[in-house]
Every structure is written in C-alpha cells, then in structure tokens.
Amino acid sequence: MDPTVVLITGCSSGIGMHLAVRLASDRSQSFKVYATLRDLKAQGPLLEAARTQGCPPGSLEILELDVRDSKSVAAAQACVTEGRVDVLVCNAGRGLFGPLEAHELNAVGAVLDVNVLGTIRMLQAFLPDMKRRHSGRVLVTASVGGLMGLPFHEVYCASKFALEGLCESLAILLPLFGVHVSLIECGAVHTAFYEKLVGGPGGALERADAQTRHLFAHYLRGYEQALSEAQDPEEVTELFLTAMRAPQPALRYFSTNRFLPLARMRTEDPSGSSYVAAMHQEAFSNLQTQENAKAGAQVPGVSDTASSALICLPECAIPRVASELGWSASDKPGQDNSCYQQKI
C-alpha cells in the first residue's frame, strides 16, 4: 500500500517540526513526510528530533520552501518524487504583537504575506492536482485569534480571520472534488513562534500614546502568564492526526476548550456587544480595580470588598454562556437579569 504523502510548511520548530517527526516516526510507517523550511540553515533541530525519535530511512525529506515566493513553492513541489501530495499542512505563520500605531507597515505586510498570501500560494499550487485526483486533505494551523478579536493582536487576528473565511469558503466547495479542508484551532502553544514576533513585542512603542503604553504593559503581564500555561506541541499534533484519519473531517478542531465560551458569545450575540464587553472585562478589569483602589474609589454597584466586577450582557446573550465563564446572575438592587458577576 502506498504511503500517505504529507507536505508541511514551517517545520523549523514548534508544531510543524513536531508534526513532521510524529508522522515520519509513526509505527504504521504509513506516511512519507516532506518537511519544508524557509531556510535550510535552520534544519538542525528538525534533524535532531528525527534522529531522536528514530524516523526510518526515507520517511522524512527536508525541502526548502518559502511561502512568500511562488517560485520557491513550485520548486519544492517539483521535488515530491511521488508526483502527488495527499495531505497539505499549511503551518507556516508569523506574529505581530503590540499597539497598532507602533507597527511598521512593512512588518504588517510581512505578517499578511506569510499568513494569508502564503497559504493562498500553497493552495493554488497543490489544490489543482487534488481536485483532478478527487482526493486530498488540507489542514491549516489556525488560532483562536481568528475566531475572536484580541487587544494588541489586531494585525495577527486580521490575518487569522482571513484564513477562517478562506477555509470555510473552500470547505463548502471542495467536497464536490473529494477534497476536505480542516482548521486546527490552537490557543497558546509552547513554540518559538512567540520569540519570532515581527519587530518584537510592541514594536516602536514610542509611537503610541502614554495611556496605550500603560495598558499594553498591563496586558503583557497577563499575556506572559497565559504563555506559561501554554500547551505542548505534542498535544496539538494529535489533532492533526485526528483530522487526517476522520472519514468526514470537521471544518474545525480545537486544541483547547478554554476559549469556546467566548467564541460562542460572538455567534449568540451577532451585534458583538457581549463579546467585546466580556473580553474587555477579561483583559482590563484587574487594572480598573487596581486603579479604583488606588484612588480610593468604589466601583458603582459593587460591594466595598471590590472582589467582583459587573458586566452587562444584552438580552440575546444566553445565560448558559455566562455561567460557563464563571459568572452568576446579579441580585443587586437596580441590576436586571442581563447583568452578571465574575470574580476577579
């Protein structure tokens, strides 16, 4: 039986590297993996991981592929000796983090070029053959940042929102050609991704006003805490295998349930008010409480202990969602049933 030919982008580290080695070392020996990197000088960790995991000879080949360059994509495609790719994994990605006005436009363009146009270049190269053969799987490394807006991730979220629309649109069409598209929705993962943020965290911060810089510094402390609780890449790679092996793969697979209540809020209140208020609460309520305490002020409608903050949800927001977020209906005088408390 012919092996399943898998081509993966962005394999110098993180999810791409772990997935390539996981498939190439699989005991079934049913995968032939083409692990691609933008620069072959960065292949050292991948080679070491393959050696450590005992990848059999011929199970893993490393190719140079820069998703920003159509000629590079075509050259890598020509190196696939089987003449086909059964599973295409679009994993290469780039991040940008900090106040929007602090970013250089070339850094913004680089993120969009890799995350959006890079994925499109790969699809344009490999989809035609999959459609001709009436067989193929496309897996795209996505992010909760493509399902909900996150402060100080505006450009990154824009790129990931674009991937959601791209893949969802293709998922409607491609089953007619025997091809399936799946998004692997990741939260924070322990990879080098966060060390490679374009321009570093915040970029040229002096371009932002003092209040925005203050808010960013506060947000960054919570962000660092979130990264300390990130998943290991090995956990996430198993989701890719699930999507590969499913007879009828889903459009989305989630590596964590942590953000699902917030994501559901966006669909259950199409106005967006519930989600915006909830994320504001999540990101900045501690700061507001601290500043109120420093000023000797009391948050209106909240007890002197200031141990909880109030957020008002529109009537269309389902109470179950609030409950999943750890909120309870407020019984305080003057508050209606659309108000909930969350301990902070």
UniProtKB/Swiss-Prot annotation:
Pathway given in the UniProt record: Steroid biosynthesis; estrogen biosynthesis
Top-level enzyme category: oxidoreductase
One of the GO BP terms on file: skeletal muscle tissue development
Active site, per annotation: Y156
Subcellular location(s) of the protein: Cytoplasm
UniProt cross-references to InterPro entries, sorted A to Z: 17beta_DH, NAD(P)-bd_dom_sf, Sc_DH/Rdtase_CS, SDR_fam
Modified residues (Phosphoserine): S135
Annotated substrate binding sites: S143
Chemical reaction(s) catalysed: 17beta-estradiol + NAD(+) = estrone + NADH + H(+); 17beta-estradiol + NADP(+) = estrone + NADPH + H(+); testosterone + NADP(+) = androst-4-ene-3,17-dione + NADPH + H(+)
EC number assigned by the record: 1.1.1.51, 1.1.1.62
GO MF term list: 17-beta-hydroxysteroid dehydrogenase (NADP+) activity; estradiol 17-beta-dehydrogenase [NAD(P)+] activity; estradiol binding; NADP+ binding; protein homodimerization activity; testosterone 17-beta-dehydrogenase (NADP+) activity; testosterone dehydrogenase (NAD+) activity; testosterone dehydrogenase [NAD(P)+] activity
GO CC annotations on file: cytosol
Binding site for NADP(+): 10-38, 66, 160
Binding site residues for NAD(+): 3-32
Family to which the UniProt record says this protein belongs: Belongs to the short-chain dehydrogenases/reductases (SDR) family.
Record's function text: Favors the reduction of estrogens and androgens. Converts estrone (E1) to a more potent estrogen, 17beta-estradiol (E2). Also has 20-alpha-HSD activity. Uses preferentially NADH.
Binding partners and assembly: Homodimer. Exists predominantly as a homodimer but also exits as monomer.
Annotated protein name in UniProt: 17-beta-hydroxysteroid dehydrogenase type 1
Species of provenance: Mus musculus
Organism classification: Eukaryota, Metazoa, Chordata, Craniata, Vertebrata
